[in-house]
Amino acid sequence: MNVLEQVIENRYALYNGDSCEIAKAIPDNSIHYTIFSPPFASLYTYSNSDRDMGNSKGDDEFYNHFIFLAKELYRVTMPGRLLSFHCMDLPLMKERDGVIGLKDFPAIIRQIFEDCGFIYHSKVTIWKNPVTEMQRTKALGLLHKQIRKDSTMNRQGIPDYIITLRKPGENPERVSHTHESFPVNVWQNYASPVWMDIRQSDTLQKKLARDDKDERHICPLQLEVIQRCIELWTNPNDIVLDPFAGIGSVPYTAVKMGRRGIGVELKESYYNQAVNNLEIAVKGDVMECPVGQMSIEDFLTANPA
């Protein structure tokens, strides 16, 4: 396994490296749940690495690279268990794409996973304020002056989505809740097809993960989104994987909720911040392991405290 750095503690494992390579070292049917936000093709530049999927020359190259990871994620997921990804429709720009419009990026990623064998399970729309989007992007379709000019070019804002897929087979470890631990009013909120109450600012501190030499966008998942998915679809001590861990939002939340987390991140500054965040999550000393000292298999079979 080609790992640049790694930190392993009894509740989590973080790897600085290429998720396509590191996923190959994860045993079959060993991951209880995966949740992540995929790179948005060529929309953002996350790092300068030629291994970064976000640096693909075009959509076809990105999708071809992503298929390799999707196949590995199918292999490592336990039968009957779930994988969720967080993304949005992508804007088409006149100067880059030749037209103004939208690309259904979530549907393309979902189809890749279905082609690997996953079953489409559910979809949640996460409301986002269109005024904030307009102020940030100055998108033509959201400008009020366009209403006065020609409103056929106006559109609604772009929400986020959580799309969840299930691996076929019988779940060997059922996820069960009690009325007390998961009351009906909570379930009614989670069962809504639209989550209206997610605060976009509800993320881990990301300032320290920026490189001055990079351009550079970081798009951490909102903590409340991660919490809801983990609460609904996992048991305590389950292993939660994020192959694009960024600053560690998913493993951080998993550990705080009594689960175990695996995070893989290619960019060094993001990885280093993830290490700091996980140290905060466990509130104790972590065991730093030189590359090659402990395998993923060792972590998966360890008896958690």
Task: Describe each model-derived feature in a short phrase.
Residues N2-Q273, I296, A305:
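Core catalytic lobe of class I
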Residues I108-I109, V275-A305:
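Class I S-adenosyl-L-methionine-dependent methyltransferase module
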